[in-house]
Amino acid sequence: MLQQVPTRAFHVMAKPSGSDCNLNCDYCFYLEKQSLYREKPVTHMDDDTLEAYVRHYIAASEPQNEVAFTWQGGEPTLLGLEFYRRAVALQAKYGAGRKISNSFQTNGVLLDDEWCAFLAENHFLVGLSLDGPAEIHNQYRVTKGGRPTHKLVMRALTLLQKHHVDYNVLVCVNRTSAQQPLQVYDFLCDAGVEFIQFIPVVERLADETAVREGLKLHAPGDIQGELTEWSVRPEEFGEFLVAIFDHWIKRDVGKIFVMNIEWAFANFVGAPGAVCHHQPTCGRSVIVEHNGDVYACDHYVYPQYRLGNMHQQTIAEMIDSPQQQVFGEDKFKQLPAQCRSCNVLKACWGGCPKHRFMLDASGKPGLNYLCAGYQRYFRHLPPYLKAMADLLAHGRPASDIMQAHLLVVSK
């Protein structure tokens, strides 16, 4: 069968280690996905599946487009360095003359000089999970034996910097860390971090369907389910982002790049680049599990969202399937009336469907749990975003806003 090219731009993220991880972070939503593959005690991608993934992904991409490989988990370093050497060799084999990039999300525990030299030499972009100072990070990010991991992650950060690896830091914002935005932000800045992404931690305890599948956390959908004790509160997530934005705009514009601010600016000026959950629709970013199974989204790895298997179907067939088309379009079609009439709709777009388990003001389902936080954040930003857009339009750097005095009238 000839490989088809999907009708629109897409992205595939691979999980070569499946849900296997060397840590036991309390809030991780992926560890329990091992229950979906009970027949396989070890969920690591074999060489045949690796080659199929690389070959199919490159073939499914338009020749003029960059092919962006993303490796995640579980913990992708568990596959060992040789696995990624083979991956890079396969990319060269099947992608001769093509522009290819690699990104890699890790907890950093297994990184050493050899790993970092490889990552630098092959221009990998590394996403390092680090939640802030030790007392915040160690509360939930622990080893299988319950030991703290902060020192190990800071060692990894030092190694990445030593080898000049391109990296960013991924910060999970939970109920505790949401109380200390500037402590988290300043700690990262003091550690030399320049690129930061803040991720809200929101999970519910499992419903009956999920329990039958051996899961502890609630599957997306419906309005049932008790929140976990570590889930961030909506208002506090909004205040967390606002506090960091206000701190950043006074001293760090052009020096520190906070992705949550970058996405908001992109939507404000009508430019591409906003993350999927702040786009009108989704469904163009799928994941490949260790055995070639393809799922609708990283947050929707459940049997009902399985699109097929790469060994039997092309990537194009699965991404352009009616099932996936409906999945992506429902992000907009199922917005409740409260969202459609909201004055920050075009900044928020309802957020991730996974978090839409609340009732809106009229009692209709589909409101995002984080709605109050998003409203607080997105209503705070426009005067500043407009000022930066105006500066850029006049050929001046956005950082000039740090010398400006804005009169912002609260509404």
Regions found by a protein language model. Name each.
Residues 55, 59, 78-197, 204-206, ...:
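Conserved AdoMet/S-adenosylmethionine-binding subsite of the radical SAM
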Residues 14, 34-40, 69-73, 138-143, ...:
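Glycine- and acidic
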Residues 1-106, 110-117, 121-122:
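Conserved alpha-helical substructure of the radical SAM core
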Residues 21, 25-28, 276, 282, ...:
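Disulfide-bonded cysteines in secreted/extracellular proteins and peptides
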Residues 301-411:
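Flexible mid-to-C-terminal extensions adjoining Fe-S/redox cofactors in radical SAM and related proteins
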Residues 141-151, 158, 162-277, 281, ...:
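Radical SAM enzyme [4Fe-4S]-AdoMet core and its adjacent flexible, acidic
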Residues 290:
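A cytosolic small-molecule/anion-sensing beta-strand core signal
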